[in-house]
């Protein structure tokens, strides 16, 4: 089993572990990077242990202009051609609301140091062609059962295959969990809905994704979405139910709005291929 590790999460989660504010003086205290490096190694080792990894992990990081520029300098040193930086395709698709428009999180002090450390010590894949690390992980896992996506990002659970979410603070670990393409919805102990596969995808098409500023359908909440999808057992049934609600809510704009929302929410599993609705009359 090969762990596919979402390092975008690690960059922030462990990055902030390298600094804190003194309660008495209010002074920002930075810890030595050696401490943080040890913390990173132990976290990755623990994740690999929890998923019973038999192969070294592959770490995924979403590209940025800064990272692409740095990698192009490295390519120049080795005589390779530079690679053009391509902005995440979802930003140009989002017309209703800016994609990730509510995120204003500052980067931890050691953010770029962690990237350098991971690239020097692990097998790191940096996303290309306007994809996010999430998409690259799903493309790697597509059609396989010998990999496991390790992330605390719920969106990745759309992808078929094995999944694991590690413990963080009061949030318990989830998995390993296996999902087929259809997937399922269930309720956690705290009452929150958790989903996998196409059921999660269609659920998000209804309720949206506040973390990424994707609105979904107006005035469709968790309870209505779960009730609509819970007892449907094929992609055709789920698509028809969601399509009908889109038409009811959005009228003549339903087709374009569905296209926008689906392209934003879909985790790319094959390069260049977005979500394709089932053909009419397909059994």
Residue ranges and their predicted role:
Residues 1-80:
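Non-catalytic, usually N-terminal nucleic-acid engagement modules in DNA/RNA processing proteins
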Residues 23-28, 53-54, 79-88, 94-282:
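Extended two-metal-dependent nuclease catalytic cores across DNA- and RNA-processing enzymes
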Residues 1, 282-283:
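Short, Lys/Arg-enriched, disordered terminal segments
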């Amino acid at each position: 089993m090969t762990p596919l590790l979402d390092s975008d999460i690690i960059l922030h989660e462990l990055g902030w572990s390298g600094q804190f504010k003194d309660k008495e003086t209010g002074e920002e205290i930075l810890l030595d990077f050696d401490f943080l490096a040890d913390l990173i190694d132990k976290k990755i080792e623990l994740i690999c242990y929890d998923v019973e990894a038999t192969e070294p992990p592959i770490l995924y990081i979403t590209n940025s202009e800064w990272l692409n520029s740095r990698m192009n300098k490295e390519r120049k040193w080795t005589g390779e051609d530079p690679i053009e930086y391509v902005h995440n395709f979802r930003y140009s698709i989002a017309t209703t609301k800016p994609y990730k428009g509510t995120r204003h999180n500052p980067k931890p002090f050691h953010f770029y140091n962690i990237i350098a450390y991971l690239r020097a010590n692990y097998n790191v894949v940096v996303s290309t062609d306007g994809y996010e690390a999430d998409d690259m992980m799903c493309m790697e896992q597509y059609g396989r059962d010998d990999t496991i996506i390790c992330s605390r990002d719920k969106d990745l659970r759309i992808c078929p295959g094995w999944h694991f979410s590690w413990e963080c603070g009061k949030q318990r670990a989830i998995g390993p969990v296996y999902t087929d393409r259809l997937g399922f919805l269930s309720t956690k102990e705290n009452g929150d809905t958790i989903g996998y596969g196409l059921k999660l995808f269609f659920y998000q098409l209804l309720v949206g994704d506040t973390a990424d500023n994707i609105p979904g359908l107006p005035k469709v909440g968790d309870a209505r979405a779960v009730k609509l999808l819970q007892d449907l057992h094929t992609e055709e049934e789920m698509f028809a139910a969601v399509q009908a609600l889109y038409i009811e809510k959005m009228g003549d704009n339903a087709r374009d709005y569905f296209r926008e929302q689906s392209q934003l929410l879909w985790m790319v599993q094959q390069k260049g291929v977005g979500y394709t609705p089932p053909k009419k009359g397909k059994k």
